[in-house]
UniProtKB/Swiss-Prot annotation:
EC number: 2.4.2.17
Subunit description: Heteromultimer composed of HisG and HisZ subunits.
GO molecular function: ATP binding; ATP phosphoribosyltransferase activity
Compartmental location: Cytoplasm
GO CC terms of this entry: cytoplasm
Main location: cytoplasm
UniProt note: domains: Lacks the C-terminal regulatory region which is replaced by HisZ.
Record HAMAP family: HisG_Short
Pathway assigned in UniProt: Amino-acid biosynthesis; L-histidine biosynthesis; L-histidine from 5-phospho-alpha-D-ribose 1-diphosphate: step 1/9
Official protein name in the record: ATP phosphoribosyltransferase
Family: Belongs to the ATP phosphoribosyltransferase family. Short subfamily.
Amino acid sequence: MIRIAIPTGRMLEQTLDFLRNFDKKLLDEEKGRKLRIRGERFEVFLAKPWDLPLYVEERVVDLGIIGRDVILEQERNLVNLLSLPFGYCKMVIAGYPHISLEKNGKEIKIATKYENIARKFLEDKWSKIKVIKLNGSVELGPILNISDFIVDIVETGKTLKENGLEIKEVLFESSACLVSNVASFVYLRDEILSFVKEVRKLNDKCN
């Protein structure tokens, strides 16, 4: 049986619906407050999105389903098997309409919970940046005048508009990804590759 961690939060229902295509017994399980759901093929663990990559890397589980944004931010030693057809969002720079992205020689302040992504994508864009880590609503950065822009994921952009902000630039598009750790990929190679093949077939049908 393959142990797989899936994220709580916005992608939970989509992820469970996706896995039920490959393990019908998961349909019989009521989630409730359970953090572990046992199917016929998978043993599923519900984890906080930011903890999930650690569980995969440390081989607590064999596979994980997590957003590309978290993978790029944490830079853990994972085997990225393939992208999945849900969990779509965009990583963007956003700010007030009247503030331009043009270089002006000043230090640019960025509010974000994605510190590594902000530095990776923006240090080449601006010579001087200051990344301000926020764990809550990053839209407060410009509102409270502690940052010029924010870097964050958006799905519809509704929250940005409600707070008077607009997308300045899309850094990359993100979706859910299926990942493994090196050890599990070696020892469960046949099972994992068989599952990946089934996922690809389902993806082809959906496209």
